[in-house]
Amino acid sequence: MAKTQSPLQWLATTIIRGYQLLISPMMGPRCRFNPTCSHYAIEAIRLHGVVKGCWFAGKRILRCHPLHPGGEDPVPNKKHRCDK
């Protein structure tokens, strides 16, 4: 069963999706990570919510530059309060 998105999650993922469809194709492939930063942002927002997801996405985007080696960098799993 699919989890429903909050209106803020929907808005954030729609903006990122718009970037993927309209802006990213004109710039060409530049991201050195897998998944790409925009896919990472959508996944982080869906998994962790808007605030924490945007925090993870912002940290990831700051690492996406020519001096960073890149590579595999999946979204961290959601930790529950009982996990330490």
UniProtKB/Swiss-Prot annotation:
Pfam family, one: YidD
Keywords: Cell inner membrane, Cell membrane, Membrane
Keyword Cell inner membrane: yes
Segments forming a coiled coil: none
Cellular component per GO, a single term: plasma membrane
Protein function: Could be involved in insertion of integral membrane proteins into the membrane.
Protein name: Putative membrane protein insertion efficiency factor
Organism taxonomic ancestry: Bacteria, Pseudomonadati, Pseudomonadota, Gammaproteobacteria, Alteromonadales
